[in-house]
Amino acid sequence: MIKRIIITGGPCSGKTSIIDGLKDEGYKCFNEISREVIQKMNIKTSYKNIDFEETVFKKRKRDFLNAKIGVNFYDRSMLDNLAYLKINNHEIPTKFKIDCENHRYHPTVFITTPWEDIYTLDDERLESFKDSMQIFEALKQVYIEANY
């Protein structure tokens, strides 16, 4: 049986640290891929365009389909793209909605809370702490609306 478990949350809220710990314990984990895409697309602003979201969404769908028998952990999921599209005032493509409906993860989602004491910016983390809080709230809403 395949279990796909999501760990999500705003930027710099500890998701990747949790994923790294799970990897150390031998679990199959799928990394956050936004950083890689930000580097390749040379993005220098916290505003993400639809091309960025499309690229990230496709890679997250690929990761979903590449799950192995057993427990698989995901540093974010396809649903995160829906939250980011909403925040950036983009219309959510119908194909994104359909893929999210047809590719279900485990019903329990772990969402990390933004933590100002550990919050740092870098070349790929371009959102402010305030932005992180807005993203956190948007993520919660998207997952609730999707019945997680």
Outline where the language-model segments fall.
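Conserved substrate/cofactor phosphate-moiety recognition/catalytic segment
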Residues: 23-62
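Conserved glycine(s) of the Walker
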Residues: 14
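Glycine-rich phosphate-binding loop used to anchor ATP phosphates in small-molecule kinases
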Residues: 54-104, 119
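P-loop (Walker A) phosphate-binding loop of NTP-binding proteins
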Residues: 10, 22
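A glycine- and Lys/Arg-enriched "phosphate-lid" helix/loop adjacent to the NTP-binding pocket
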Residues: 89-148
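Hydrophobic anchor at the beta1->P-loop junction of P-loop NTPases
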Residues: 7
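Post-Walker A alpha-helix
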Residues: 18-19
